[in-house]
Amino acid sequence: MNNIRHIIFFLLSFIGLSAKAQKTDAMMQLPPIQRAALIIKHFEGWHSGKGPYIGWGHRIQPGEHLSHNITRQQGDSLLYEDLRKLFNQFKGYGDYALLLTVLSYNVGPAKILGNGKYKPSRLIQKIRQGRKDIEQDYLDFCRWKGRVIPSIKKRRWAEFQYLYPIQ
């Protein structure tokens, strides 16, 4: 009886791994911008309550007259427009532009590129130097108030796995 149970558990775990591999393959078949949008949608979630964010994490800017009861289609449009604007800031980084765009959607471009308040991140410094060993520096963007947040680390890992340019 125990042997049968072990065999069933083994087969079920194998089926689960196969389904996960198929899902990963399907995700990689999508265009990179759609992969980026799906990752953001998954981890950001839908913002419909109070606060400065609406849709899939769009921050309402001064002068924008948007309400919190927008449709999912409007939320998608805002997401793609935000990604386009951020991508324009990073397009000089070649293959890394989309990865940096998705990161900046969550942390803001100033924390990556630097400005008067922040110095350029180690991640952007390595990319500018042409170094490829950026995984740990990318995953280090998982802190909030100095603490590592597991859900953010999981998000960074997913972003890196699906958007890091394979060379």
PLM regions and their residue ranges:
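N-terminal secretory signal peptides that target proteins for export/translocation
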Residues: 1-3
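Short, solvent-exposed, charged loop/turn and helix-capping segments
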Residues: 87, 91-97
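Short N-proximal segments of mature Sec-exported proteins
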Residues: 97-111
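Sec/Tat signal peptide C-region and signal peptidase I cleavage site
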Residues: 17-21
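Long, amphipathic alpha-helical surface segments
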Residues: 11, 22-50, 58-64, 70-89, ...
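Sec-dependent N-terminal signal peptides
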Residues: 6-15
